[in-house]
Regions:
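Alpha-helical transmembrane signal-anchor/signal-peptide segments
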Residues: 26-41
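Membrane-interfacial entry segments at the cytosolic side of transmembrane helices
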Residues: 2-12
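Membrane-interface motif at the C-terminal end of an N-terminal transmembrane signal
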Residues: 16-28
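Extracytosolic and intramembrane catalytic regions of membrane-associated proteins
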Residues: 38-147
Length: 203
Protein backbone atom coordinates (compact mmCIF):
# COMPACT_ATOMS: atom_id res chain seq x y z
CA UNK A 1 0.00 0.00 0.00
CA UNK A 2 2.82 2.38 0.93
CA UNK A 3 4.62 1.71 -2.36
CA UNK A 4 1.41 2.37 -4.25
CA UNK A 5 1.01 5.75 -2.53
CA UNK A 6 4.64 6.69 -3.28
CA UNK A 7 4.29 5.57 -6.90
CA UNK A 8 1.06 7.53 -7.23
CA UNK A 9 2.74 10.63 -5.77
CA UNK A 10 5.67 10.52 -8.19
CA UNK A 11 3.35 9.77 -11.10
CA UNK A 12 1.30 12.85 -10.20
CA UNK A 13 4.48 14.95 -10.03
CA UNK A 14 5.54 13.66 -13.45
CA UNK A 15 2.14 14.50 -14.95
CA UNK A 16 2.19 18.02 -13.46
CA UNK A 17 5.79 18.60 -14.62
CA UNK A 18 4.95 17.37 -18.11
CA UNK A 19 1.90 19.65 -18.23
CA UNK A 20 3.93 22.64 -17.03
CA UNK A 21 6.66 22.00 -19.63
CA UNK A 22 4.13 21.69 -22.46
CA UNK A 23 2.42 24.97 -21.48
CA UNK A 24 5.78 26.73 -21.05
CA UNK A 25 7.01 25.55 -24.45
CA UNK A 26 3.75 26.54 -26.12
CA UNK A 27 3.95 30.03 -24.57
CA UNK A 28 7.54 30.45 -25.78
CA UNK A 29 7.07 29.22 -29.35
CA UNK A 30 6.24 31.90 -31.94
CA UNK A 31 3.66 31.03 -34.56
CA UNK A 32 4.62 30.97 -38.22
CA UNK A 33 2.29 33.79 -39.22
CA UNK A 34 2.42 36.90 -41.37
CA UNK A 35 1.84 39.05 -38.26
CA UNK A 36 5.12 37.74 -36.84
CA UNK A 37 7.19 37.60 -40.01
CA UNK A 38 6.18 40.83 -41.77
CA UNK A 39 6.74 44.14 -39.98
CA UNK A 40 5.13 46.92 -42.05
CA UNK A 41 6.42 50.43 -41.45
CA UNK A 42 3.00 52.08 -41.36
CA UNK A 43 -0.52 51.11 -40.33
CA UNK A 44 -3.37 51.22 -42.91
CA UNK A 45 -4.22 54.66 -41.48
CA UNK A 46 -0.67 55.94 -41.95
CA UNK A 47 0.69 55.86 -38.40
CA UNK A 48 4.23 54.57 -38.00
CA UNK A 49 4.25 51.22 -36.20
CA UNK A 50 6.37 50.57 -33.13
CA UNK A 51 8.26 47.27 -33.51
CA UNK A 52 10.33 46.22 -30.49
CA UNK A 53 12.32 43.33 -31.91
CA UNK A 54 14.45 42.97 -28.76
CA UNK A 55 11.62 42.13 -26.36
CA UNK A 56 10.32 38.78 -27.60
CA UNK A 57 7.42 38.35 -25.18
CA UNK A 58 4.66 36.28 -26.80
CA UNK A 59 0.91 36.15 -26.32
CA UNK A 60 -0.64 33.03 -27.83
CA UNK A 61 2.37 32.70 -30.12
CA UNK A 62 2.31 36.31 -31.38
CA UNK A 63 4.88 38.98 -30.50
CA UNK A 64 3.41 41.42 -28.00
CA UNK A 65 5.61 44.45 -28.59
CA UNK A 66 5.40 44.64 -32.37
CA UNK A 67 2.82 46.19 -34.72
CA UNK A 68 1.76 48.94 -32.31
CA UNK A 69 0.11 52.14 -33.60
CA UNK A 70 -0.79 53.66 -30.25
CA UNK A 71 -1.99 57.12 -31.27
CA UNK A 72 -4.80 55.85 -33.50
CA UNK A 73 -5.52 53.00 -31.08
CA UNK A 74 -6.20 55.52 -28.29
CA UNK A 75 -8.86 57.26 -30.37
CA UNK A 76 -10.45 54.01 -31.56
CA UNK A 77 -10.53 52.49 -28.06
CA UNK A 78 -11.99 55.60 -26.42
CA UNK A 79 -14.87 55.44 -28.92
CA UNK A 80 -15.48 51.75 -28.18
CA UNK A 81 -15.29 51.87 -24.37
CA UNK A 82 -16.20 54.08 -21.43
CA UNK A 83 -12.87 53.20 -19.78
CA UNK A 84 -10.20 55.55 -21.19
CA UNK A 85 -7.13 54.04 -22.86
CA UNK A 86 -4.78 55.38 -20.18
CA UNK A 87 -6.97 54.32 -17.23
CA UNK A 88 -7.13 50.94 -15.47
CA UNK A 89 -9.38 47.96 -16.14
CA UNK A 90 -11.69 46.43 -13.53
CA UNK A 91 -8.81 44.38 -12.10
CA UNK A 92 -6.71 47.47 -11.52
CA UNK A 93 -4.33 46.77 -14.42
CA UNK A 94 -3.38 49.47 -16.90
CA UNK A 95 -5.98 48.80 -19.57
CA UNK A 96 -3.57 49.88 -22.30
CA UNK A 97 -1.58 46.69 -21.73
CA UNK A 98 -4.70 44.56 -21.35
CA UNK A 99 -5.75 45.80 -24.81
CA UNK A 100 -2.31 45.03 -26.25
CA UNK A 101 -2.28 41.51 -24.84
CA UNK A 102 -5.86 40.70 -25.82
CA UNK A 103 -5.46 41.92 -29.39
CA UNK A 104 -2.11 40.14 -29.70
CA UNK A 105 -3.67 36.88 -28.49
CA UNK A 106 -6.07 37.13 -31.45
CA UNK A 107 -3.19 37.59 -33.90
CA UNK A 108 -4.18 41.20 -34.57
CA UNK A 109 -1.96 44.22 -35.05
CA UNK A 110 -2.48 46.94 -32.46
CA UNK A 111 -4.10 49.59 -34.67
CA UNK A 112 -7.51 51.16 -35.31
CA UNK A 113 -8.43 48.76 -38.12
CA UNK A 114 -7.79 45.74 -35.93
CA UNK A 115 -9.69 47.24 -33.00
CA UNK A 116 -12.73 47.62 -35.26
CA UNK A 117 -12.73 43.82 -35.61
CA UNK A 118 -13.40 43.34 -31.89
CA UNK A 119 -16.94 42.45 -30.92
CA UNK A 120 -18.74 44.07 -28.02
CA UNK A 121 -18.07 40.94 -25.98
CA UNK A 122 -14.32 41.34 -26.56
CA UNK A 123 -14.42 44.95 -25.37
CA UNK A 124 -16.27 43.87 -22.21
CA UNK A 125 -13.73 41.11 -21.55
CA UNK A 126 -10.88 43.62 -21.88
CA UNK A 127 -12.66 46.04 -19.54
CA UNK A 128 -12.96 43.15 -17.05
CA UNK A 129 -9.20 42.58 -17.19
CA UNK A 130 -9.04 39.53 -19.45
CA UNK A 131 -5.72 39.51 -21.30
CA UNK A 132 -6.56 36.82 -23.85
CA UNK A 133 -9.56 35.84 -25.95
CA UNK A 134 -8.83 32.18 -25.15
CA UNK A 135 -10.69 30.65 -22.22
CA UNK A 136 -8.76 28.56 -19.69
CA UNK A 137 -9.72 26.86 -16.45
CA UNK A 138 -8.63 28.63 -13.24
CA UNK A 139 -5.53 26.46 -12.77
CA UNK A 140 -4.21 26.98 -16.29
CA UNK A 141 -5.07 30.68 -16.19
CA UNK A 142 -2.97 31.10 -13.02
CA UNK A 143 -0.15 28.97 -14.41
CA UNK A 144 -0.03 31.02 -17.61
CA UNK A 145 -0.11 34.23 -15.57
CA UNK A 146 2.93 33.13 -13.54
CA UNK A 147 4.83 32.06 -16.65
CA UNK A 148 4.04 35.42 -18.28
CA UNK A 149 5.34 37.24 -15.17
CA UNK A 150 8.54 35.20 -15.34
CA UNK A 151 8.91 36.01 -19.05
CA UNK A 152 8.47 39.72 -18.33
CA UNK A 153 11.03 39.60 -15.52
CA UNK A 154 13.53 37.86 -17.83
CA UNK A 155 13.00 40.54 -20.48
CA UNK A 156 13.02 43.64 -18.25
CA UNK A 157 14.78 42.52 -15.02
CA UNK A 158 12.10 44.54 -13.24
CA UNK A 159 10.17 42.64 -10.52
CA UNK A 160 7.55 45.37 -10.08
CA UNK A 161 4.00 44.54 -11.19
CA UNK A 162 4.90 40.82 -11.19
CA UNK A 163 2.98 39.65 -8.10
CA UNK A 164 4.83 36.44 -7.17
CA UNK A 165 8.26 37.46 -8.45
CA UNK A 166 7.90 40.83 -6.73
CA UNK A 167 7.26 39.09 -3.39
CA UNK A 168 10.29 36.84 -3.77
CA UNK A 169 12.42 39.82 -4.78
CA UNK A 170 11.46 41.87 -1.70
CA UNK A 171 11.84 38.86 0.63
CA UNK A 172 15.36 38.43 -0.75
CA UNK A 173 16.12 42.13 -0.16
CA UNK A 174 14.69 41.96 3.37
CA UNK A 175 16.73 38.86 4.27
CA UNK A 176 19.90 40.40 2.85
CA UNK A 177 19.30 43.62 4.82
CA UNK A 178 18.57 41.71 8.03
CA UNK A 179 21.65 39.47 7.65
CA UNK A 180 24.01 42.47 7.61
CA UNK A 181 22.93 43.77 11.01
CA UNK A 182 21.01 40.89 12.55
CA UNK A 183 22.44 41.38 16.06
CA UNK A 184 22.36 45.14 16.70
CA UNK A 185 19.66 46.07 14.20
CA UNK A 186 19.32 49.43 12.46
CA UNK A 187 17.65 51.66 15.01
CA UNK A 188 14.48 53.73 14.55
CA UNK A 189 13.74 54.21 10.86
CA UNK A 190 17.09 52.77 9.86
CA UNK A 191 15.67 49.53 8.49
CA UNK A 192 13.58 51.29 5.83
CA UNK A 193 16.60 53.30 4.70
CA UNK A 194 18.75 50.15 4.56
CA UNK A 195 16.04 48.33 2.57
CA UNK A 196 15.90 51.24 0.14
CA UNK A 197 19.68 51.11 -0.39
CA UNK A 198 19.63 47.34 -0.97
CA UNK A 199 16.77 47.75 -3.45
CA UNK A 200 18.70 50.38 -5.44
CA UNK A 201 21.79 48.17 -5.50
CA UNK A 202 19.78 45.16 -6.69
CA UNK A 203 17.82 47.07 -9.35
Amino acid sequence: HRLAVIASFFLSLAVIASYFISVYQEMNTPKVDIVNTELPKYSPNGEKYLHDTINNTLENGFYLWRNIAEIELVTAWNKASNIPFYAVDKRGQEIKYTIYRYMTSMGLRKDANSLSQLRRGDVIRIENGETTYLKYNLFEKRLRSLIFEFQQYKQTKNPNNQTLIQRFFYWKIALKTFSKHWFFGYGTGGYKEAMSKEYKMAS
